[in-house]
């Protein structure tokens, strides 16, 4: 009798875990839908890490494209090519970034990564869902995403990369109608910048 009770309890725990995992995926799916707004979205952010310190900036996103601006650099990504203007050096580096590179630069890149071999878990904290993603042999080993329950807007993203945690806090999230031209570097706007092609 005790063995049967233990087995039933074990099955119920497994089922509860599966249902909880489905809920985490549903929350991430809804969040991806919000962030992937057809016209685009804009937000402010603060990035904190022991390795790089703190950086504030703004980001505009439309599909896989993004444009980020901080005091140190401006980044354009058109879905394939990335241009990074380093303000201090007046130079533009051009490359085709990897998924891990994009995650380090675009905090919302998780909306494409979470379906690729990550295990989910979820808890709640006040008016937020807290979704944890863990993956083996990934550039980003773990992500903890805090998502507002009513709006499904991500308000904080923590990433574990190379044994270092980076925290990204997001504010002023809003939908927008963004032109594709803002996601490409315009050399006319930076006539004196040195362009270094790393592709």
Regions found by a protein language model. Give the residues of each.
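Short, hydrophobic/aromatic-rich segments at coil-to-beta transitions
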Residues: 39-44, 62-68, 125-132, 151-156
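N-terminal leader/targeting segments and the immediate start of mature chains
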Residues: 2, 15-53, 64-65, 90, ...
């Amino acid at each position: 009798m005790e063995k049967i009770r233990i087995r039933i309890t074990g099955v119920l725990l497994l089922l509860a875990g599966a249902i909880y995992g489905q809920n985490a995926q549903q929350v991430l799916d809804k969040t991806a839908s919000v962030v992937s707004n057809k016209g685009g979205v804009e937000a402010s952010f603060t990035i904190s890490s022991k390795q790089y310190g703190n950086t504030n900036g703004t980001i505009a996103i439309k599909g896989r494209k993004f444009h980020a601006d901080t005091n140190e650099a401006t980044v354009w990504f058109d879905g394939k090519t990335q241009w990074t203007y380093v303000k201090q050096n007046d130079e533009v580096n051009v490359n085709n970034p990897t998924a891990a590179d994009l995650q380090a630069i675009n905090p919302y890149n998780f909306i494409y990564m979470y379906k690729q071999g990550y295990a989910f878990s979820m808890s709640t904290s006040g008016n937020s869902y807290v979704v944890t993603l863990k993956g083996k042999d990934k550039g980003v080993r773990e992500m903890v995403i805090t998502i507002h329950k009513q709006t499904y807007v991500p308000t904080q993203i923590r990433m574990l990369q190379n044994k270092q945690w980076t925290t990204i806090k997001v504010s002023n999230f809003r939908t927008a109608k963004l032109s594709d031209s803002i996601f490409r570097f315009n050399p006319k706007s930076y006539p004196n910048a040195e362009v270094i092609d790393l592709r």
